[in-house]
Amino acid sequence: MLEGCILAGSRQIESTTNNSVPGAPNRISFAKLREPLEVPGLLDVQTESFEWLIGAEDWFQRAVDRGDVDPKGGLQEVLEELSPIEDFSGSMSLSFSDPRFDEVKAPVDECKDKDMTYAAPLFVTAEFINNNTGEIKSQTVFMGDFPMMTEKGTFIINGTERVVVSQLVRSPGVYFDESIDKSTEKTLHSVKVIPGRGAWLEFDVDKRDTVGVRIDRKRRQPVTVLLKALGWTNEQIVERFGFSEIMMSTLEKDNTAGTDEALLDIYRKLRPGEPPTKESAQTLLENLFFKEKRYDLARVGRYKVNKKLGLNVGQPITSSTLTEEDVVATIEYLVRLHQGDQTMTAPGGSEVPVEVDDIDHFGNRRLRTVGELIQNQIRVGLSRMERVVRERMTTQDVEAITPQTLINIRPVVAAIKEFFGTSQLSQFMDQNNPLSGLTHKRRLSALGPGGLSRERAGLEVRDVHSSHYGRMCPIETPEGPNIGLIGSLSVYARVNPFGFIETPYRKVVDGVVSDQIDYLTADEEDRHVVAQANSPLDGDGRFEEERVLVRRKGGEVEFVSASEVDYMDVSPRQMVSVATAMIPFLEHDDANRALMGANMQRQAVPLVRSEAPLVGTGMELRAAIDAGDVVVTDKAGVVEEVSADYITVMADDGTRHTYRMRKFARSNHGTCANQRPIVDAGQRVETGQVLADGPCTENGEMALGKNLLVAIMPWEGHNYEDAIILSNRLVEEDVLTSIHIEEHEIDARDTKLGAEEITRDIPNVSDEVLADLDERGIIRIGAEVRDGDILVGKVTPKGETELTPEERLLRAIFGEKAREVRDTSLKVPHGESGKVIGIRVFSREDDDELPAGVNELVRVYVAQKRKISDGDKLAGRHGNKGVIGKILPVEDMPFLPDGTPVDIILNTHGVPRRMNIGQILETHLGWVAKAGWNIRLASDGADGSTEVPAWAAKLPEHMLSAPADSIVATPVFDGAQEGELQGLLGATLPNRDGETMVNSDGKAVLFDGRSGEPFPYPVTVGYMYILKLHHLVDDKIHARSTGPYSMITQQPLGGKAQFGGQRFGEMECWAMQAYGAAYTLQELLTIKSDDTVGRVKVYEAIVKGENIPEPGIPESFKVLLKELQSLCLNVEVLSSDGAAIEMRDGDDEDLERAAANLGINLSRNESASVEDLA
């Protein structure tokens, strides 16, 4: 499989980043190193794989230019594999070729709006050949609608945006393993030949020193039986393996004489109970390993086998089945490995090293990207179709057959649909913010069909491996059961034609580092000596030091002379993923906390006003642009018109381009996706320039949170255990306010009793409730709604009612039916509120496509403005997370000497044991960036000299001063040094009163807002970037008075989604018993839970102001009796005088009478949907 060539373009990093994107903000960078390679397209892993699948022109051109890759698309490959389909006699055949696509049926936005799939019709040329007459019939055949990838690397399936995650699997090939026998403590060796498709072949040396073989995981046999079955004589075996004692002893123990006996022996093991014949045994063995239909090593497997065993190296790959030479070379390799040889002479004469394989090495694990996953699914669909075609060939008249009559496309369409709809690797896209979407597309999963399972995966496969360097991020992985099984592609990594991940290195020749970029797989890297990116170089690219720190195979680190170095890293951030590369001062954070920081950035919600970080890493711009949520110019020109909804650009070639904005759209996760222009009419724009910001972006840079003035100190114990204290200013000024949009949907269907109707005419509802509904019964845009309010009025027929004889006579004469309807309106779910911002109505009358039986569909969008509140979760980028414990009035917050109150107070205890010191350094640099600096001014001597201090000697001229509110970048592993930080803190600009607030140690004297007294010790103060996470208290807080009950036990349901109650469990009952609170306990176990009669009577007593009646028998007790009776145990309940009490299954009459009198229904059972509960 091909991932296109990424050309290495050289670029000099000056001390500002973002130079490669026109109009980008000028971020002052502390980077010391030059990066010779631009960050590649971050979505290439998705887009290029899909281009390979459909054989897109761009991909085809790249493949032809590259030369070492078969320029054949994935669909073409599958069709060639399938063709020709022949009937059982071989007299007819059907071939497929030339897959091509028509235009997509509808644009992306329309597909999302109307719940359609973004797809294009696929056509192939089908050729039917009658081999008897030589007649050829050719037709263009429609093969179904094929889901297409959007520009952002996603798929729209039934209106929802989905991502296909790349899968990490063990590569087909030959794997040698070593183990210790527990009884004899001997070293045993084994080898597995793993195909892409087909039976496994395993060889091993056991503790008795015999070489055995297992075919298709069946019983073990001497390996010489297999060799004889392949036609080898004893003499040939001795000639090839005479050097090995264990092979000779195996041959002696083998009782089979000749090929025929060996074949029959194998057949008996594989097909026990079936009568063996020489022909059937020969056919079985050939089918198992030597027929392409049954056995497929895949191109990658053939490549790996050739490389391992030294066969046909450098020759083009033609066959993908096993050969006799493969089997023999594998056995020889195993034997030599067991006897301790270091090398083996391959049949071609080359020497290959003899060693065991590490299955967790990235040379043995490959990536199945989108294109290959879909290709495999199409292969499954086509093989099902093949059976149908064969059957139809035999049943239809030869003269009347055309390709169209033979082909049934249903299996193919169903296979594609099944993959996108239900596969573990086709996932609902994470759209919390642009970074979460980008990371989702770059995710690598070891789970899924053909992969590992959570339960089976051990520690080794989850662990960080030296071969991950530059390929998979060692930091970013989920916490919990999936840790280590799901990873993220490193920034510079790409995927090669065989699916192995490659990473770029700079070529070093005789100690001189060149700008030539070579992409190496993990196998190739093991053969070289690699220096790190920050090894000091002189002006000619030579290493400054004689001894250079390098790494060798297995991640071993040592010092070697400069002439021994083969390659050098291209960038210090080469090993990490995009999210991890956005953590400033990552090098000062513990890995566990950095993991949390990388993961929590993906949970940040877009705020009403986005703000880019004062302290960034230089990765923000590329991440935001490649995520695809900003609007970028296609052609350079001049902005002609700007409005909130669109931007028109007159291009230099005279064409006019209109770019539309997404306005307050709902993302998959209910966050608000809104785009707003950042250019003005008349402004000149270049190709690739950002025209409009999206959610979580500012001036085209990723902006996930806010820069807040932070004080790191304890405050009256209110920020104990990671609690956070906030200033009320953040609430009043909507600094941390986010907009959340919920979609509510209702449809009007045909029922057995008649059609449902969307109407304003709802029975038993007052006019006040209907005030905001229009004449159709749909709420107006702009209406404020609370839980329980009607959004769309709907009535459902209830069926005929009992009529008096007189009414029946009238109905018979006039033909009218007494229709009764019940209210099934769409209401705002419990605990939600907001403002109606959009309504979409789809109707069969307007020729909209609707599911069968649905006449009308209404969608209502309700937006909620959520201010920050107690209980919301905030986090920094270093894994420093906490819940808001208290929001203080501004006047009570600690303040700086000039009267500036801080925004947020974090506890000091959250830093030392978590070892994420990056947050402290970020706070210091944040203050420096906000205040601005002038190094010359600070070092001004008494004699008026303005010499630059030693710590600033390496800084370029324009970094010696910066105005207030500057933005800076400190790239990972190449950022601001501690000495620079300390110097800059001493060189910050004074405020308008001429005072510097923060000392050179980063601390300031703070004053208590309540008393005005200074705190006894100076406090660390600065600006930290704080994210508001999606764990909002409004989504979690919940209370219930009456609600639904479980059908069997009649106890209240649990959880907010079910509008459930709080469980009073076994241990809580013990606590009540311990305190002797008998009546409280009785209440909890009966009338507050499952005493069906008692709870209605209690409600009645409360309404009428009477005393609470005695509790009855709880339903769960009756369930217990039934369960005991079902075990044939006769259980009776006796009264105090010993008489048996009759247990009724439910005092239904009392219950119904009481409920009817009160006009309530307390005994709501489990309901089908949450809407019914409100």
Swiss-Prot record:
Keywords: DNA-directed RNA polymerase, Nucleotidyltransferase, Transcription, Transferase. InterPro entries: DNA-dir_RNA_pol_bsu_ext_1_sf, DNA-dir_RNA_pol_bsu_external_1, DNA-dir_RNA_pol_su2, DNA-dir_RNAP_su2_dom, DNA-dir_RNAP_su2_hyb_sf, RNA_pol_bsu_bac, RNA_pol_bsu_CS, RNA_pol_bsu_protrusion. Pfam families: RNA_pol_Rpb2_1, RNA_pol_Rpb2_2, RNA_pol_Rpb2_3, RNA_pol_Rpb2_45, RNA_pol_Rpb2_6, RNA_pol_Rpb2_7. Transmembrane segments: none annotated. GO terms for biological process: DNA-templated transcription. Its EC number is 2.7.7.6. DNA-dependent RNA polymerase catalyzes the transcription of DNA into RNA using the four ribonucleoside triphosphates as substrates. Belongs to the RNA polymerase beta chain family. This is DNA-directed RNA polymerase subunit beta. It comes from Mycolicibacterium gilvum (strain PYR-GCK) (Mycobacterium gilvum (strain PYR-GCK)).
